[in-house]
Amino acid sequence: MRITISHDRPKAEIIEAVDRSFNDLFKSSAQLPVKITVQERTWRGSILNFALTAKWGLLSTPIKGTVEVTDHDVTVDADLGLFNRFISEKTARTVLTDRVKGLLK
């Protein structure tokens, strides 16, 4: 799943906001009855590489991807693993898009 959202703030400010709020970006919500645990997050320049584990009951699946911050956009590119079988991509995309937009305000 890939989402791109435009912004009009300085790139460094967006990187700082993403880093500060990363855990909140992927935390569980009422729309997603899943517990998300951050396994790894590493910045390389303006690209954040991440690895998460999504757990729903006895089932768990890895989620990995990147968050790339440019001068005008934030792009989240994530492999949702088996997560897509339990939550529609549309729901996951909506929740993640709303959270990134909230982060950019």
Q: Which residues does each predicted region cover?
A:
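Extracellular/lumenal and peripheral-membrane lipid-interaction modules
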Residues: 1-105
